[in-house]
Structure formats: C-alpha cells, structure tokens
Amino acid sequence: MFMINLLMMIVPILLAVAFLTLVERKVLGYMQLRKGPNVVGPYGLLQPIADAIKLFTKEPLRPLTSSISMFIMAPILALTLALTMWTPLPMPYPLINMNLGILFMLAMSSLAVYSILWSGWASNSKYALIGALRAVAQTISYEVTLAIILLSVLLLSGSFTLPTLITTQEHIWLIVPSWPLAMMWFISTLAETNRAPFDLTEGESELVSGFNVEYAGGPFALFFLAEYANIIMMNIFTTILFLGAFHNPLMPELYTINFVTKSMLLTISFLWVRASYPRFRYDQLMHLLWKNFLPLTLALCMWHVTMPIITAGVPPLT
C-alpha cells in the first residue's frame, strides 16, 4: 500500500514538473511578445512529452577523463533528494507524518549540495567545477537565512511538525505579522533553487552552462527534473509557512484546491521574476546575504523570541 501511495505522489510531481517547463517557456514567450512553443500538439501542449522523448533517447555521452560512478550518481542523487523532500508536506495529509518535518526538509536541502559538488568535480572540466563551487557557496550561504527564518516561524507555531502550521494559521496568515521574514524567505528561496536573478551557476557568458555542462540526454534530464521539482516544492513550503490554507477535516479537497492555487501563483511569480530581472553580480549576491539578510533575520528572530515572553504577562482584553 505504501508503494502505491509513493507512486501516487511521485507521478503527479513529475507531471507537474514536465508542464512547468512548458508554462515557463510560454510565460517567457508572452513577456517577450512572442508565442512560445506552439507546434507540438494543440497550443504546444505536448511539448514536454516531445522533450522527454528527445532527451531520454539520446546517447548518454561521458567525458573520457570523468570519474564514471560519481558522474552517474550525481543526477540520480539530485532527483532522489528532490523527491524525498516532498514526503512530509501536508497536502492536507502528508505521505509520512514526521515529528520533525521542518528539520527533515532543511537536512535534505543541505544534502542536495553534494549532488552539485559531485557533478562538477566528476565532470573533470574547469567550467563545471567553477559552476559547482559557485552553486555550493550560494546554496550553503542562503540556507543560513532560511534556517533562521524557519526558526522565527517555529517560535510562532510552537512545533517542528508541518501540520501544526495549518492550525496556527486558522485565524490569520503568518505573512501578516511577519511580512519582512516572508519577503526575505521568498528571495532566499529564489537563491536556494538557483533561479534568476541568482542563477550565477549557469552564467552562459562566462561558464557555458554551469555544473551540468558535460551532461547530455538522460542524466541532464534528471538534473532538470530535480531543479524544477525543487522550485515547486519550495513554493509549496512557502505556502504552508506563510499562506496557510484553511483545513476542514470534513472536506479536505477544499484545502487542496486552495493550497495548490496559492502554490501555482507563487511558482508563476518565480517565472515572472526570471523574465523581469537581470542577473546579480557574484559579490552583490553574497553581500545581500551576509551584510543585509543575516543581520535582519537575526534581529527579527530575537524579536520573535522576546515578543511572546513580553506579552505573556498581559491579561486578556476580552
């Protein structure tokens, strides 16, 4: 039964990822006053399927000097971790109801660094290695603020369990009292998933294509799937943390519809940002984090620690 549940989760994720690539190309197309893919199938709807067939039927090329096992393991690890992170997400019922769901997600997102590092190192190409090192530095740096913001939100909800956040937000979304955290969280998720304007790892002008420059066909498709699965997952996480949908146990479908709509809007805003903003310079990216976000998040975290203690002694006003 568990295997069926697992498949029922993985297959829709992969389908969502496939069509997210199409949505992205359409959104970018319309924002640049053109049509986007419109040849394969009606309105280009079969484009992701054509892409998948093309990628998985290509011969998987491998550089002669690369280390084989790591080179093949890296994309598999990337996709496995990307899919594993979905297990504790309440939609409204999680696949595995974990006691420390939030901690698990942080740990998994930290492990994702290894797949990038291995792929860059195993490719034995200087461009791939530079791209991988950039990606790792960026991911590790932005995880610091993500962890502090999560801690502040946890101080409001009072539990590491994700479904508790739904209960916390029955009366008011957490984006209302802690909107500065939500803004910084959104920008940090952009950086964490290596999306524009933080896609320095894929700087075509200077690094060809970043850490996956030597990959082609199937392994490249796995990296691609992992990246987009992470994007959707991060937006779902944002929805759970700051835009909690109302959950009525008698009609869980309503929660799912509400939740999916919010997540989709956030995902489209990711694509919107990509179409609108130019890429950051690397030093600006690091300064933004270490000199702006980190002091701010630490101060706000202290605020979230002290406020409940200060207001605990205030008698109820009703």
From Swiss-Prot:
Has UniProt tagged this entry with the keyword Membrane? yes
Entry GO MF terms: NADH dehydrogenase (ubiquinone) activity
Membrane topology term reads:
Multi-pass membrane protein
- InterPro entries, per the entry: NADH_UbQ_OxRdtase_su1/FPO (IPR001694), NADH_UbQ_OxRdtase_su1_CS (IPR018086)
Q: What PROSITE patterns does this protein map onto?
A: COMPLEX1_ND1_1, COMPLEX1_ND1_2
| Keywords in alphabetical order | Electron transport, Membrane, Mitochondrion, Mitochondrion inner membrane, NAD, Respiratory chain, Translocase, Transmembrane, Transmembrane helix, Transport, Ubiquinone
Q: Record's GO cellular component, any one? A: mitochondrial inner membrane
The entry's localization annotation reads:
Mitochondrion inner membrane
Pfam families in UniProt: NADHdh
Please give a single GO biological process term from the UniProt record: mitochondrial electron transport, NADH to ubiquinone
> Which EC number applies?
7.1.1.2
The reaction(s) this protein catalyses: a ubiquinone + NADH + 5 H(+)(in) = a ubiquinol + NAD(+) + 4 H(+)(out)
User: Which positions, given as ranges, span the membrane?
Assistant: 2-22, 68-88, 100-120, 146-166, 171-191, 222-242, 253-273, 293-313
| Family to which this protein belongs | Belongs to the complex I subunit 1 family.
Q: Report the HAMAP family cross-referenced here.
A: NDH1_NuoH
Subunit structure comment from the entry:
Core subunit of respiratory chain NADH dehydrogenase (Complex I) which is composed of 45 different subunits.
Q: What is the recorded function of this protein according to its Swiss-Prot or TrEMBL entry? A: Core subunit of the mitochondrial membrane respiratory chain NADH dehydrogenase (Complex I) which catalyzes electron transfer from NADH through the respiratory chain, using ubiquinone as an electron acceptor. Essential for the catalytic activity and assembly of complex I.
Protein name, please?
NADH-ubiquinone oxidoreductase chain 1
Organism whose genome encodes this protein: Hipposideros armiger terasensis (Formosan leaf-nosed bat)
Instruction: Kindly list the organism's lineage.
Output: Eukaryota, Metazoa, Chordata, Craniata, Vertebrata
